[in-house]
Swiss-Prot record:
It comes from Escherichia coli O139:H28 (strain E24377A / ETEC). The keyword Nucleotide-binding applies. It is an enzyme of class 2 (transferase). This is Selenide, water dikinase. The gene is selD. The record marks 20 as: Important for catalytic activity. The lineage of its organism: Bacteria, Pseudomonadati, Pseudomonadota, Gammaproteobacteria, Enterobacterales. Mg(2+) binds at residues 51, 91, 227.
């Protein structure tokens, strides 16, 4: 079977970050008395479902550690590897850090797909690592029923510049660095609904490196940061609000969207992860039309950064975004928490 004739997405039951275990089920899996062990040097663990773990070395520098892997979200092997690696490295940038090394995680159905195709996947991952300025230093592989690829990434960050998802403040403005709709467009492609003019759009967005995160972290007024991935904008914004004890007001019309996304939602191109996300986070949002809900719960793979920014830092953040060629979009604000109101209010 040639590399050009395969459709990798046919070999997996899920796609990209949409194959994540639902937040509700994950809560059950992670619940453990042993998890309450506290290391005073562990600045960020899994308490707030942040993007990565952070360990203070005690010398002004902290180590960031993360891993992320998934099944194919696109058919092209090289692009699959590149997207998976970009997505994994993003967690380091979302914490305000600089990646220094990565190792690969590969599961491959040896009896179904050739090793040459796996090599192309790995080369895509290596390409993304080079873009981030790091080496793909090794890895581990297993014979698996479905193709899986990703990275474990190590990074460093000045301890005082660590950006968490739980330190936002009322009064912060909310900004996104990438449009939503990745899950919808990739599902539309899988269902042969994607229009020719929309081919490749999701792949291009997923391959954009969130490298600006380290520069955003140097701005004092950036109070919190996370990347929007498998739990959708609603899930990751809800976690930001819960961690900080605030509520969000979001302007739906202001949210950047990939072309055609609302049309594809109406055609039923909604990934399975959308329903799982709504089941976990839907109770935190107010009433809204089904198509709005489906976009906010759309699982993003290698999505953009979500920033909570104090008003006085807005211009500096915009200037920094422009330096990286980012179309930064203001989508709402954070307000003091009040009982009886939805945690995420869509206007």
């Amino acid at each position: 079977m040639s590399e050009n004739s395969i459709r990798l997405t046919q070999y997996s039951h899920g796609a990209g970050c949409g194959c994540k275990i639902s937040p509700k089920v994950l809560e059950t899996i992670l619940h453990s008395e042993q998890a309450k062990f506290v290391d005073p040097n562990l600045l960020v663990g899994n308490e707030t479902r942040d993007d990565a773990a952070v360990y203070d070395l005690g010398n002004g520098t902290s180590v960031i550690s993360t891993t992320d892997f998934f099944m194919p979200i696109v058919d092209n092997p090289f692009d699959f590897g590149r997207i998976a690696a970009t997505n994994a490295i993003s967690d380091i940038f979302a914490m305000g850090g600089k990646p220094i090394m990565a190792i690969a995680i590969l599961g491959w159905p040896i009896n179904k797909l050739s090793p040459e195709i796996a090599r192309e996947v790995t080369e895509g991952g290596r390409y993304a690592c080079r873009q981030a300025g790091i080496a793909l230093a090794g890895g581990h592989s297993i014979d698996a029923p479905e193709p899986i690829f990703g990275l474990a990434v190590t990074g460093i960050v000045p301890t005082e510049r660590v950006k968490k998802n739980s330190t936002a403040q009322a009064g912060c403005k909310l900004f996104l660095t990438k449009p939503l709709g990745i899950g919808v467009l990739t599902t539309a492609e899988k269902k042969s609904l994607l229009k020719p003019e929309h081919q490749g759009l999701a792949t291009e967005v997923m391959c954009r490196m969130n490298i600006a995160g380290a520069s955003f972290a140097n701005i004092e007024g950036v109070k919190a940061m996370t990347d929007v991935t498998g739990f959708g904008l609603l899930g990751h914004l809800s976690e930001m609000c819960q961690g900080a004890g605030v509520q969000a007001r979001v302007d739906y019309d202001a949210i950047p969207k990939l072309p055609g996304v609302e049309e594809y939602i109406k055609l039923g191109a909604v990934p399975g992860g959308t329903e799982r996300n709504f089941a976990s986070y839907g109770h935190l949002m107010g009433e809204m039309p089904r198509e709005v809900r489906d976009l906010l719960c759309d699982p993003q793979t290698s999505g953009g950064l979500l920033l909570a920014v104090m008003p006085e830092a807005e211009n500096e953040v915009k200037t920094t975004a422009a330096e990286f060629g980012i179309e930064l979009t203001a989508i709402g604000e954070l307000v003091p928490a009040r009982g009886g109101r939805a945690m995420v209010e869509i206007r």
